[in-house]
């Protein structure tokens, strides 16, 4: 159960990683500023973003994929996701839990439960 929570936390951090990378690129482009001390962090975050996107794409095509994509990648709240997908909010939360379980099972079967945080 603890590893499942870690997986969900990794998914939740997608937007944080993406914002960090975007802010670094913005600063470089518009202010001609690039923090060289943050290069390693940027590389780590890009790797984590790729891991998250790969995990979510494992579920494609399915309602679980659509929900995870909208929620974690696009940053849309579950209530709005349920509206977009013509689901009740309760069904969307159930679908979210089901998607988390499928991802956790996939990660365990592939043996890729190494530390990603």
Where are these regions (language model features)?
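N-terminal interaction/assembly modules
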Residues: 1-58, 80, 107-117
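Short, conserved sequence motifs enriched in acidic/basic residues, glycine, and aromatics
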Residues: 58-59, 86
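Short amphipathic alpha helix immediately N-terminal
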Residues: 59-76
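Helix-turn-helix DNA-binding module
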Residues: 74-91
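DNA major-groove recognition helices of helix-turn-helix
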Residues: 92-106
């Amino acid at each position: 159960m603890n590893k499942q929570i870690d997986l969900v936390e990794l998914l939740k951090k997608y937007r944080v990683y993406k914002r960090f990378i975007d802010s670094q690129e913005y600063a470089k482009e518009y202010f001609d500023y690039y923090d060289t001390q943050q290069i390693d962090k940027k590389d780590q975050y890009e790797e984590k973003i790729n891991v998250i996107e790969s995990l979510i794409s494992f579920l494609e095509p399915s309602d679980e994929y659509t929900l995870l994509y909208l929620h974690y990648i696009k940053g849309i709240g579950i209530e709005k996701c349920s509206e977009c997908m013509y689901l009740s909010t309760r069904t969307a939360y159930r679908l979210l839990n089901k998607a988390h379980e499928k991802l956790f099972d996939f990660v365990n079967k592939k043996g890729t439960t190494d530390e990603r945080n």
